[in-house]
Amino acid sequence: HVVCRRQRQMCIRDSHYTYAFLGDGCLMEGISHEACSFAGTHKLNKLICFYDQNGISIDGKIDNWFTDDTAKRFEAYNWHVVEIDGHDFQQINKAIELAKSETSRPTIICCKTKIGFGSPAKEGTSNVHGSPLGDEEILSTRKNLKWEFNKFEVPSSVYKDFDFKVQGQILEDNWQIIVDEYSAKHPDLYKDFKRQVAGQLPKDYERKFTEFVDKISVDDEKIA
């Protein structure tokens, strides 16, 4: 369930966000219209999408086959639209906070980016779309970005920023408190929640499905 069933005051189903990462090629496909229109119609405010808007596909610049105004398109779907510089970390963080504050619409964060950022010869071209830079261009890119570390060396400052063990344990402990309280107050819903997480169908699914098939097989009503 995307929104808390029966609007319980405490609901572990509704305490998370779903993040998706999209590219120009993704939004060209027809299925994107169906899915995004559905999300907007049903006000799935826990859905946050990052659109990597670099204007490049594997066949080159998209100008000749994809000229949609994506921001207006998603506004028409009833989405919350945030446009940012996709290389600006502060803008990214602020956009995520704005998305989380939205309570009635899904959010798309349009990140204007340059594919192959930092590569002197291949930045902004389809040559870096799924293809390696090559040894010479790697050296040029490292020099251009002033990256002085050796191959496969991760700076200690990066390790520090990504070390989420302590904070992660705190969040896990807080989450467990919520789960315990929820399971005590709503044991039936919690049991159903665990079933869904385990990917299991309800015990009466087969019976209900058979009854449904039997009904429509003898019903005169035409179903498309």
Feature-to-residue mapping (PLM):
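Conserved acidic/glycine
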Residues: 16, 22, 26-30, 48-50, ...
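Boundary/activation segment at the start of structured domains
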Residues: 40-48
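Single conserved hydrophobic/aromatic residue that forms the stacking wall/gate
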Residues: 1-12
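Conserved catalytic motifs of the protein kinase core domain
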Residues: 7, 15-17, 46
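A structural signal for short coil/turn segments at secondary-structure junctions
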Residues: 13, 42-43, 102-103
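His/Asp/Glu-rich metal-coordinating catalytic cores
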Residues: 33
